[in-house]
Swiss-Prot record:
Binds 2 manganese ions per subunit. This is Probable cytosol aminopeptidase. PANTHER family: CYTOSOL AMINOPEPTIDASE (PTHR11963:SF23), LEUCINE AMINOPEPTIDASE-RELATED (PTHR11963). Its cofactor is Mn(2+). Keywords: Aminopeptidase, Cytoplasm, Hydrolase, Manganese, Metal-binding, Protease.
Amino acid sequence: MALQFTLNQDAPASAAVDCIVVGVFADKTLSPAAQALDSASQGRLTALVARGDVASKTGSTTLLHDLPGVTAPRVLVVGLGEAGKFGVAPYLKAVGDATRALKTGAVSTALLTLTELSVKARDAAWNIRQAVTVSDHAAYRYTATLGKKKVDETGLTTLAIAGNDARALAVGVATAEGVEFARELGNLPPNYCTPAYLAETAAAFAGKFPGAEAEILDEAQMEALGMGSLLSVARGSANRPRLIVLKWNGGGDARPYVLVGKGITFDTGGVNLKTQGGIEEMKYDMCGGANVIGTFVATVKAELPINLVVVVPAVENAIDGNAYRPSDVITSMSGKTIEVGNTDAEGRLILCDALTYAERFNPEALVDVATLTGACMVALGHQTAGLMSKHDDLANELLAAGEHVFDRAWRLPLWDEYQGLLDSTFADVYNIGGRWGGAITAGCFLSRFTENQRWAHLDIAGVASDEGKRGMATGRPVGLLTQWLLDRAA
C-alpha cells in the first residue's frame, strides 16, 4: 500500500496531524470542515479566500501555514469548482489532487475531510471507500527496478479519513490493495514478470489466506487437456506458459463467479512482428491477467461472502524457428479448429482455451478481461473499457458497477451479423475479422467458446495503462470488478 489509512472523528481544529485537507467552492462557500477551521481562526480562512489568496477552481490546491486556533501546522485547501456541478467526478478529482499535492514534501500525516461533502446519489460509505482507493492510487510510487536511482521518500504516509464507517474503510483498503497489486505486476519489465513469475506471485498470495487456494498448470498438464490454441502461441518463447487458477471459497455451496484474464507477459506480435511505436509497451499485455488477480486480492482482503475463481493463461508471444505461423490451423481445447490469420491476434487464442477450461466450474457468471484490440482504443479512447455480452442482465450489472465507482465501460454490439467475418475455408473459425469492427469481431470470436455460459467480455486496451514513456499500469478495471462482486455479495 502506498498509504496507511485510519478513521478520524476529531474536530478539525484540534486534529493532531501535519495537515488538514478542506475544500472551497467556486462561489467561495467553504466545506463543513473549512467552516470549522474558519471559526477557530476567527475568520482567517474566509479573509484569505475573499482576498484571492486561495484558489477555488477545480484542480487547484493552496497550502496555508499556521492558521490561528488550528492545531495542525498546515491546511491544504482544495478547489471544488461550481457547487451546482459537484458530483462523482469532481469529488474523486479533488481527493486525487489533494493527495498529489502532499505526495512529496514535509507532510507525513494528514486528515482528509472531503468525505463530509455531499456527493449526488452517493452515501457516506461510498465517500470513504472511494477516498481510500483514489488517494492510494495517487500516492503510488513504482520502485521495484530502480536500482541505485534515488527515491524521494518524503511526503504523505498516513491519511486519516473523516468518518466512522469501519467497514467502508476496510473495503476501500481491500480494493486499493487489489489495484496496487495489479499495478505492480503490470509495471514490472517482461524479463522480470514472466509467466512463471506471475504464477508464483499469485500462488504465494493465495497461500497466505485460509479460504484461498491456487493451482498452477504447467505445459504438460495443458497439453493433456488439449489446449492446442494456447500452446501454439507459447511455442516461440523460452519462457514456458502457465495456467493460473485461483479460488476464493467464501460462499459455501453457491456457484462461483469466474474471471478470466489475458496474461500475455510480452507480445512481440510473433511472426507478424510489431514495430517501434507500440511494441515497447507490450509488457502491459498481461494487464487483463494482473487485474483479475488484483480483483482476487481485493475479494480475499474484503472477505466477500462469495465464491470466486480466477483463471489466467500466462504466455509470452515471442518468435523463434518453432513459432506458430499465419495460415497454421490449430485445435483448441473445445475441439474447434482455428485458422491463424495473424499471429498478433494471439490474446483470443489463449483466452478461448482458458474460457473452455473455466466451464468446469459451472460459473454463475463468466467475465473475461483483456487488452485485446487496438480497435477498441480507437473507438473509445482511454476513458472507458469496451463491454460485449449477449446477456443484457449481466451487461447491465457490469455497467452499473463501473458507473458507481467511476471505472466505466461502454457496451458494443455483439450481433450475429458480424460472425460471418470470421468464416474460414480451412477451419471452423478464422482468428481475425478484417479491417473494420476489430474489437467486435474479437468479441465474436470469444463468444464461439462461451455459447453455454452467462458471459461478458471487457476489452481494456484503452484503460489498462497510461500512454507514453512515463505511463504506468492503471489497475483498471479492478474497481469495476470489485464493485460488481460487492453487489453480488449484498
